[in-house]
Amino acid sequence: MDMDSAHLDSSLLTLAFRLIKAAQTAAPSVLADLLAEGAPAWFQDDDLGWSCLHYAAERKEPECLEVLLQGGAVWNAVDKWGRTAGEICLSLGDEEGWSIIRNEGIRSEDKTSAGDNLVFLKSKLTWDVGKDGKERVLDADGNGVMMGWEEPLSYCIVVEHVKRLTEEHPKAELGAEGMSILNVGFGLGIVDRLFQECDPKPSHHTIIEAHPQVLEYIHKKGVHLLPNVRILQGRWQDWLLDGEKVGDVLSGTPDGMGFDAIFVDTFAEGYEDLKAFFEVIPDILNADNGRFSFWNGLGATNPTIYAVSSSLAELHLEDVGLQVEWHDVLIPESMREEVWKGVRRRYWDLPGYRLPIAKMSLI
């Protein structure tokens, strides 16, 4: 018996097992009655780690899923193999059931966040070289902050970000003046190096970075000495939520009218922080041809949770007047497995990456 079962009194435990059984065969009305009696919809059995929602998903009965979700079933509960009920629907080709679970996730997760950026900024980082010879940064707990694997992997993710942000932009054409770039979160500097390798080079390149050791690394590598590069020390909130400082940030852009491309990837900030960043984009992105993208890694260890996070981001970008176009990037399994050796916490475990490119909506 697991810890959740041990903390249920006998009457609730009986109701929990009745609900589990009913979810496999009974009509939606029976499920509703059990929930009305107080059956715990969050309960998961010992054998498979399945909840009532998992069993209902196996039946391909949309109404059962709706009743259970309305009764408190947890949309993102995972079984012993890390699968949500959404993955059960996907494996059975049940698009309707999967959409019901995904949409519930979007509704319920609107106010969630993860990580603690302020704690991270005070933590000690370690620069390490993996067996592949690539440099990586680990935090004090051994979590990957910025991995050297992103360099080989960049040809299917990071390079793709830069490509999508710059391709066919009028200022990125040969002979043009170059784009005005803002990158928030330096890491190992891979994205910034790729921007610098563009032809023409950026006419202006601002980097916002807050971690003291990363700032030391920037100066050690001489990034601050590159032509047209400006380093702003501090959190993006310090610069972009301060009315006076926003003017300073925009001072390097043509006529102060906004950046041509903005990319953000800040480790240990949760979705609430990303959503707050969305809200300042209309003030700092060039309205005519500006493009915005972000590292889309929230929930990236589970396909259903990842889909919910991506859909939620799209909705919130639309709320502030941006339209999003998604680009799917394939990640080879061999590469996904190799890069996590020696790292405690994975933050990517999916075969594909959804790359967002957002532009101001045309009115």
Curated annotation (Swiss-Prot):
Its main location: cytoplasm. It is found in: Cytoplasm; Nucleus. Residues 111-363 form the RMT2 domain. Gene3D superfamilies: Ankyrin repeat-containing domain, Vaccinia Virus protein VP39. S-adenosyl-L-methionine binds at F120, F186, G187, L188, G189, I190, V191, E209, A210, H211, W236, Q237, D265. SUPFAM superfamilies: Ankyrin repeat, S-adenosyl-L-methionine-dependent methyltransferases. One of its GO terms (biological process) is methylation. GO terms for molecular function: protein arginine N5-methyltransferase activity. It is an enzyme of class 2 (transferase). Keywords: ANK repeat, Cytoplasm, Methyltransferase, Nucleus, Repeat, S-adenosyl-L-methionine, Transferase. The keyword Ribosomal protein does not apply. Its EC number is 2.1.1.-. ANK repeats lie at residues 22-46, 48-80. It comes from the Eukaryota. One of its GO terms (cellular component) is nucleus. PANTHER family: GUANIDINOACETATE N-METHYLTRANSFERASE (PTHR32379:SF1). Belongs to the class I-like SAM-binding methyltransferase superfamily. RMT2 methyltransferase family. Monomer. S-adenosyl-L-methionine-dependent protein-arginine N-methyltransferase that methylates the delta-nitrogen atom of arginine residues to form N5-methylarginine (type IV) in target proteins. Monomethylates ribosomal protein L12. This is Protein arginine N-methyltransferase 2. It comes from Cryptococcus neoformans var. neoformans serotype D (strain B-3501A). The lineage of its organism: Eukaryota, Fungi, Dikarya, Basidiomycota, Agaricomycotina.
